[in-house]
Amino acid sequence: MAKIHELSENLTNQIAAGEVIERPASVVKELVENAIDAQASRIRVEVQHSGLKQISVQDNGSGIAPDQVDLAFMRHATSKIQDEHDLFNIATLGFRGEALASIAAVAHVEILTSTGGQTATRAAFAGGVKKFQEDAGSAKGTKITVGDIFYNTPARLKYLKSPKTELLKIVDIVNRIALGHPEISLTLASDGKVLLRTPGNGNLKQDVANIYGRKVAEKMLTVENEDPDFTLYGLVSEANLTRSSRNFISILLNGRYIKNYQLSSALLDGYGNKLGGKYPIAVLAIEADPLLVDVNVHPTKEEVRLSKEKELSRLITSAVTEALMDEDEASPLFQLTPFKDKTQLDQLEFNLKPNVVDTRRPDDFQLEVSQVAEPEGKTDITNKKGTETKEKAEKKENKQEEKEEKTSAPEYVDLNQVREDDQYVLTKSWDQHVKEQTALPPFAGGEEAASPVTSKADQLLRQHLPALRLLGQMEGYLLAEHGGDLYLIDQVAARRRLEYDQILASLEKDENYQQGLLEPLVFDFSVYDYQKLKDQLPLLRQLGLEMEDFGQNTLLMHSYPTWLKGEVTVQVRELLDQLLSSRENDGKSLLKLVAAKAAESNVSRRVNLTGAEAADLLLRLQTASDPYRDASGQVAVVRLSQNDLSKLFKKGK
């Protein structure tokens, strides 16, 4: 049996470092928090090679006396608490006295510090051992330089991400700290280039502008609320300014950034149903009695125990709701918007031109079925007056079609006998084009959940849909038949599958049709997002987004893919947001993600189909990569055999 023995101080420091110092961003966090606790009003962070080579944090705080330097690098030595009572009444960001000892255990550290006297102190540590200490000259404050992180624990280096990812983590933590302390001027520089600078004038909205961009700051609403235990102040975005993840929500408790799902959910509850499944940009600063907060539950202190959490949640929800109500009251009661042609709202639209050279992406189900094929090369953007005249003529024509459809529509449409007088012609060239566009491997997702009334044959045949005979439709669902089996088709999911297949095929073949802009559009980003997107410009070009770096956290867009529909700036912003929030790293997975989101955005509502439109939908599903579901896994087709129908009606029992 092995004997119990006491571990060396250096080994215990390395063990502690494993909990506290995970990556370069952890070093930055600990040193900046120490500077804040030292009452600094200016803090400068400089990193080289994403902090892997060197990290420097300089402040104008109180400094450390010469005879206290050794103690500062000893484990569990601190000036922030004195006894057990202080442990439950913590008013500082740090309190354990582990940070400097943990950093010095896994890196080379040099400190230059002064309390404002005539003599400053310079000292160096490596592997937890002091190398030297000497007098020096310096203004009041402290500068700590950390180099060669994990030099003596190379196994830790294997778990670090790419330099770009490590830099983004540093940017993120500095952003959060800056939002929690608008009274402090914070500067972050990487390899000599300034990424962030806040003025330190206490103006939170100005810090939001510096971090997320001026346009975001202009759409932020002030939230305020308080009760006997908590004081809440912050900024939340208008309901129409959203992101696809919670990453833009910062909750700061007594100046400390924390992660708390319940408080985040309380924030979302304040928006009601206005977010549409997305998330706002928000900064909530909460002041609470330290006795209500237990910080000593997590090595990085990002998770805390909070008394009266439900009361605080209600406070947050009511504050956000009130801010949004004030915004609604300030908005115009009535707004004039362009009136759309009724056929664009009530009828599915086509752009199927089999006899025309495909110079642009066919906008599936988005143009009128009666539309005459346009000349080759004609773009979606036309002369306004000409478009209006054309739309009026088409509107009249389509109304007549709808009337005829209601009075003379057959009971079903045989897919093999679609007539030319339906004003829709299928040709071999178009059929071949569809096959080429949609010949993709099966959807790489999980197994589809089996329907209670779906036989095993469905699962075996789900990658192949037979030629169906249309029976009818009801409220956006199609009913069809083949071989005595009944097929139920959700037209939205089916259209999304076809849209997904076509967009993905274009992306993978790099055959995007683009719409150029007379003047480029400017997109502002946070420092974090800007740094991430700069490296993805080649991928954006593959997606059909021609963008270039414009500096100052902005990108210029010169053209966009024609499969983006709706308001261009909104659609592009949502697409970029999806890329930023995605955890996918390989290009193919990102292309699938973009295609799926674009299909979901482009096809969002059920409409009544004409017989020809329904026939075409079923025909094209035969060549889909997975006709039985859309890219998100939503069921598109359900097959009921005669045996299934008998079971439903309990026949034979």
UniProtKB/Swiss-Prot annotation:
SMART domains: DNA_mis_repair (SM01340), MutL_C (SM00853). Keywords: DNA damage, DNA repair. This is DNA mismatch repair protein MutL. GO terms for molecular function: ATP binding; ATP hydrolysis activity; ATP-dependent DNA damage sensor activity; mismatched DNA binding. InterPro entries: DNA_mismatch_repair_CS, DNA_mismatch_repair_MutL, DNA_mismatch_S5_2-like, HATPase_C_sf, MutL/Mlh/PMS, MutL/Mlh/Pms-like, MutL_C, MutL_C_dimsub. The lineage of its organism: Bacteria, Bacillati, Bacillota, Bacilli, Lactobacillales. It comes from Lactobacillus delbrueckii subsp. bulgaricus (strain ATCC BAA-365 / Lb-18). This protein is involved in the repair of mismatches in DNA. It is required for dam-dependent methyl-directed DNA mismatch repair. May act as a 'molecular matchmaker', a protein that promotes the formation of a stable complex between two or more DNA-binding proteins in an ATP-dependent manner without itself being part of a final effector complex. It comes from the Bacteria.
